């Protein structure tokens, strides 16, 4: 019996206090540790994979995705009923990307609404035989082609390091004062068309530009955005183009990510002396804030978001994120570089933006009250301030230009 007990205890271990642990117990602990190790590895792997996917999503140009549904189309009354979203209930004039007999239609005021739907007036005539698919995309563009403005314009090509970038030039009576319009992430030049009549009425020539990887300008080697850290060079080429055409005072207006691009241009351009000021509509001032805000809205864990931002800013992760090189997010944080700003800035931003929070815009005003003025909107959503209150939006720009001495005489 003693022999059998000794055999059973063979391979047993002793604890620090002298007690003996049986082999079965030790084996169980080892198995548990092995399972824990595998689980931990799987968790870390999932976090890493999730962060890489998120980082790619931040920098990869995407096609417009449907965000509402067409529930009914009344061609006799020229009305359309859409599923209710925070955007489709907004007062004002908007656009709708569609599929079928029309690819884009203009929308007027809200006629009625309930808990699930919104009926709006059609401002684009839709024939009785029209067929539209249910999936649609609500837009603040309103105008989607330059000829809809009924203003003289010419198509131009602006030479940049990535190749010729298409632009629209709307000449006005003053050939020396120009505004260069820079669209945002995931959109094209048409986003800026709303602003052209405002400047044209003031006699200011407007140049509406494209930049690398936006679907109109040439593709870079990686085909990804760099959130303003390289795109500003294409806009800098546009500034050079304007100067060669006689521009002496240039206002740069950026929408959303176009605002981030305009700020980088202001900080880095060799043409800084010709830039008279910036107008920023719903701008990205700090990418860290924007990415975190959007990630939380999509219920992405903070750990994944943090790793994604770290992946974007580190050289070793560039092959995984497909950026080609690290993105200097610290250089894109204009709040931390506010002391370097030299140009007067007008910010138009809504506290109900819903996509790019206005916090950083408010903070920039506090950091540089000598240079930065801000018109704060409410209710209006991201880059839809013109649509919501065209009169106030236009007056804000006109008043600021006058205050800066930039109105043509």
Language-model-derived ranges and their functions:
Residues 224-245, 251:
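Alpha/beta-hydrolase active-site loop
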């Amino acid at each position: 019996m003693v022999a059998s007990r000794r055999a059973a205890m063979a391979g047993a271990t002793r604890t620090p206090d002298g007690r003996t642990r049986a082999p079965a117990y030790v084996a169980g602990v080892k198995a548990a540790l092995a399972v824990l190790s595998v689980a931990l590895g799987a968790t870390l792997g999932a976090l890493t994979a999730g962060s890489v996917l998120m980082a790619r999503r931040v920098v990869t140009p995407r096609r417009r995705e449907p965000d509402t549904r067409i529930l009914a189309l009344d061609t006799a009354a020229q009305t359309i009923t859409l599923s209710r979203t925070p955007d489709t209930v907004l007062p004002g004039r908007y656009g709708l990307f569609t599929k079928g007999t029309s690819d884009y239609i203009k929308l007027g005021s809200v006629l009625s609404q309930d808990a699930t739907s919104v009926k709006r007036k059609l401002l684009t005539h839709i024939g009785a035989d029209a067929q539209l698919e249910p999936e649609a995309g609500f837009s603040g563009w309103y105008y989607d082609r330059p000829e809809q403005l009924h203003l003289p314009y010419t198509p131009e090509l602006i030479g940049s390091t990535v190749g010729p970038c298409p632009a629209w030039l709307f000449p006005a009576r003053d050939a020396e004062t120009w505004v260069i319009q820079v669209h945002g992430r995931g959109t094209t030049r048409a986003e800026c068309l709303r602003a052209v009549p405002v400047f044209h009425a003031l006699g200011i020539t407007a140049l509406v530009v494209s930049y690398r990887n936006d679907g109109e300008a040439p593709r870079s080697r990686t085909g990804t955005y760099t959130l303003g850290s390289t795109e500003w060079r294409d806009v800098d080429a546009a500034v050079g183009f304007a100067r060669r055409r006689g521009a002496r005072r240039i206002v740069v207006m950026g929408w959303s990510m176009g605002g981030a691009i305009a700020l980088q241009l202001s900080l880095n351009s060799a043409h800084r002396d010709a830039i008279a000021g910036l107008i920023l509509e719903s701008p990205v001032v700090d990418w860290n804030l924007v990415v975190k805000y959007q990630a939380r809205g999509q219920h992405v864990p903070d750990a994944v978001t943090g790793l994604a931002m770290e992946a974007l800013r580190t050289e070793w992760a560039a092959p995984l994120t497909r950026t080609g090189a690290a993105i200097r997010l610290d250089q894109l944080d204009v709040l931390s570089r506010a002391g370097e700003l030299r140009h007067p800035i007008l910010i138009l931003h809504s506290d109900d933006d819903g996509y790019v929070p206005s916090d950083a815009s408010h903070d920039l005003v506090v950091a540089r009250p000598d240079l930065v003025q801000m018109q704060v909107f409410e209710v209006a959503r991201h880059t839809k301030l013109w649509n919501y209150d065209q009169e106030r939006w236009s007056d804000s720009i006109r008043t600021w230009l006058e205050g800066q001495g930039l109105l043509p005489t």
